[in-house]
Regions:
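Residues at the C-termini of beta-strands that transition into short coil/loop
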Residues: 53, 86, 113
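C-terminal/domain-edge helix-coil "capping" segments
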Residues: 10-14, 34-37, 41-44, 92-94, ...
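N-terminal segment of the mature soluble domain
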Residues: 17, 22-83
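Short intrinsically disordered, low-complexity segments
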Residues: 9-10, 76
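Charged, amphipathic alpha-helical segments
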Residues: 79-94
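A structural detector for beta-sheet-dominated domains
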Residues: 16-18, 86-88, 126
């Protein structure tokens, strides 16, 4: 009998959710839903996935500080890529729910080994339909699809 072994090499990514929401003192349930969905979708795409704790930020300086922490964790955890995902929420006169509305997502992808930023993109004019149960999961799936395209373009 002949046995053959196939070795699979999956890329390891580490991501970090950074929430921008002036009306929230803690990471919101919406951000946690997105974090969970991003983690699961990357796993389904075949990546080895880790993440830093979701955090709140109110400035670009704080974003950069969190970025350095997250990219350091990715490097120390032997990840191939670090992805910072910034979620932007706002309350307007049209906000119908108790929580703020997600209106923009920005992501930055960097090599965890070299620190070189390889992609950055902003998804704007997001429409969260709170009457649909899985709307945030769909937004997350679309986000992961965009990130995956950028990773594939960089041979991930």
């Amino acid at each position: 009998m002949l046995f053959s072994a196939a070795l699979c090499f999956a890329n390891q990514i580490s991501f970090q959710i950074v929430q921008h929401d002036d009306s929230a003192d803690n990471v919101t349930e919406d951000s946690m839903i997105i974090e969970d969905s991003v983690l699961n979708t990357f796993f389904e795409y075949g990546y080895i996935v880790t993440n830093s704790d979701a955090a709140i930020s109110d400035s670009e300086n704080q974003d950069e500080h969190l970025y350095k922490i997250g990219s350091g964790e990715a490097f120390n955890g032997f990840s191939d890529y670090f992805i910072q995902i910034k979620l932007y929420y706002e309350r307007t006169d049209n906000t119908l729910s108790a929580s703020s509305d997600l209106y923009k997502i920005n992501f930055t992808i960097a090599s965890a080994k070299s620190g070189v930023k390889i992609a950055e993109k902003t998804l704007e004019n997001l429409k969260v339909d709170r009457t649909k149960k899985n709307n945030l999961a769909k937004i997350s799936t679309d986000l992961v699809s965009q990130i995956n395209k950028a990773l594939k373009a960089n041979k991930a």
